[in-house]
From Swiss-Prot:
GO terms for cellular component: cytoplasm
Catalytic activity: an N-acyl-L-alpha-aminoacyl-tRNA + H2O = an N-acyl-L-amino acid + a tRNA + H(+)
Protein known as: Peptidyl-tRNA hydrolase
Annotated positions binding tRNA: Y14, Y64, N66, N112
Organism per entry: Parvibaculum lavamentivorans (strain DS-1 / DSM 13023 / NCIMB 13966)
Length: 205
């Protein structure tokens, strides 16, 4: 069993914020793989299903971002999981928009949701870092992450990324994190088709 956690802030006001892309990823997985209807549990919203034969719990903490660890810790203890069974989806300022990187352990890099989870279960959980880009100046970060994705961003990469994450999610259930990241990358950056080589014909002289 694994616990997939999407980070964000609860409520319609925040639903389309850049900071909520973790919630969007979680919702995409639930939709794509026909998980159970969401219900309130563990200070969050929970859906259950299977991915590649593995039981999976999807959790969206409703504690607000800064207290996300309370929900994650409660769910992890209930299911008797280890941090290695926990995969967290969250927004990453230090990655270009649409880039996805996998990581296990490490620091929080200023992300309050990650800091809270590490405080409750330790740092050795698996992380899906979803790039949202940086506004360029530190004093603009708060307004940027709590701002909505533009229509152009949504059409250009957000929708494609959420679909790609949902499509590749079974790889996370079986521990193939690097393959997951590569599959998502290729969905957003398809390799150009190689044209078959044609033999040059000798021209008339």
């Amino acid at each position: 069993m694994i616990l997939l956690v999407g980070l964000g802030n609860p409520g319609e006001k925040y639903a389309r914020n850049r900071h909520n892309i973790g919630f969007m990823a979680a919702d995409g997985i639930v939709r794509r793989h026909s998980f159970s209807p969401p219900r309130a549990r563990f200070q969050g919203i929970v859906s259950e299903g299977t991915l590649d034969g593995e039981k999976v719990i999807v959790l969206k903490p409703t504690t607000y971002m800064n207290e996300s660890g309370r929900a994650v810790g409660e769910a992890m203890r209930f299911y008797k999981l280890t941090p290695a069974d926990v995969v967290v989806f969250y927004d990453e300022l230090d990655l270009e928009p649409g880039k996805v990187r996998m990581k296990t352990g490490g620091g929080a890099a200023g992300h309050n949701g990650i800091r809270s989870i590490a405080a409750h279960i330790g740092p050795e959980f698996r992380r899906v870092r979803i790039g949202i880009g940086h506004p360029g100046a530190k004093d603009r970060v708060l307004g940027y992450v709590l701002g909505d994705f533009s229509k152009a961003e949504t059409a250009d990469w957000v929708e494609t990324l959420i679909e790609a994450i949902a499509d590749a999610a079974p790889l996370l259930a079986t521990g193939k994190d690097a393959t997951f990241a590569n599959k998502v990358h290729l969905a957003l950056n398809p390799e150009p088709e190689k044209k078959p080589k044609t033999k040059e014909k000798d021209g008339d002289e």
